[in-house]
């Protein structure tokens, strides 16, 4: 099978969903901007050679409906002969886009793909028009439809204390802020948005980071999902944000022929299911499957990105994979979704992009990106620098 490499990976800044920088910018516009930027940044690539654009998005309605991948593409100069499709694996959608494109290249269905994802949670809320089948209560726990309650359950199962969660939440903001101050968010491409006064500007910094977050300030917040006995607060949950991310991937042979330098190759991929009531456990079996396919163990992973849906969830998975005592220098070195937010369709390729940048910055060879998925799934990708 063909070797698949990542040639480029970028993202927009993350905007707050409530009256944030992208309050007047549509999801298709954010997506089209990144599609165009990937072409602009890689002039050796003839856009006609792109086989497909695969875009992740969860709430496929309103401005995000009717195949947002194609709608966004039509806002660009990418030839109309290039195809585009939108995929949905809830939180793992854009990582699923990466997996689908990788499989396409490996099986000979084209050499060049553009993948990514978007979610404008300000314009299309996460729970907009959700209508669960009433009969699901017979086959799945009530908590299955409440992501916060699944985090509460998983945290209790794994002994993740309120103090551990508060420290992890503060860590996310502190590390993300340090990365911003030190200019380490080199994956961000300036994107048009509006400041607090409504002035249109090019925005090149995340709006969601709270630099003043501390373990002490986190400890003062009340539990939001289980007010009586709970430990999960707004501060230890992923922020609601708007954003997009994108990657250009191709076969190693095509990259060489075009004179493009690969940044990483895909070593292994996996998805897995778990009980929907502890949906946040999904990264554990997905990671185990991916590592087995790569012929590796967690000892081989030098850096990892765990999507921070909730501190209780991320810490539970880190513990189950044997890293709870050693994760500080390996996991989410620039913070994560607690600080940046979790725009659902965007996050899979966002954490993959962040991981690749961190692997380069820290001269590491093997990295893992993994995330939980609502209703009980997980997805994981193992990357190797080349």
From Swiss-Prot:
Name of a matching Pfam family: Thiolase_N
Pathway: Lipid metabolism; fatty acid beta-oxidation
InterPro entries found in the cross-reference section: FadA (IPR012805), Thiolase (IPR002155), Thiolase-like (IPR016039), Thiolase-like_sf_Thiolase (IPR050215), Thiolase_acyl_enz_int_AS (IPR020615), Thiolase_AS (IPR020610), Thiolase_C (IPR020617), Thiolase_CS (IPR020613)
Any GO BP annotation: phenylacetate catabolic process
CDD domains: thiolase
Entry keyword set: Acyltransferase, Cytoplasm, Fatty acid metabolism, Lipid degradation, Lipid metabolism, Transferase
Subcellular location: Cytoplasm
Gene Ontology molecular-function annotations: acetyl-CoA C-acyltransferase activity
GO terms for cellular component: cytoplasm
Claim: Transport is one of the keywords in the record: no
Residues forming the catalytic site: 91 (acyl-thioester intermediate), 342 (proton acceptor), 372 (proton acceptor)
Recorded catalytic activity of this chain's protein: an acyl-CoA + acetyl-CoA = a 3-oxoacyl-CoA + CoA
HAMAP family reported for this sequence: FadA
PANTHER family given in the database record: 3-KETOACYL-COA THIOLASE FADA (PTHR43853:SF11), 3-KETOACYL-COA THIOLASE, PEROXISOMAL (PTHR43853)
Assembly behavior: Heterotetramer of two alpha chains (FadB) and two beta chains (FadA).
Entry function: Catalyzes the final step of fatty acid oxidation in which acetyl-CoA is released and the CoA ester of a fatty acid two carbons shorter is formed.
Protein name per its UniProtKB record: 3-ketoacyl-CoA thiolase
Primary gene name: fadA
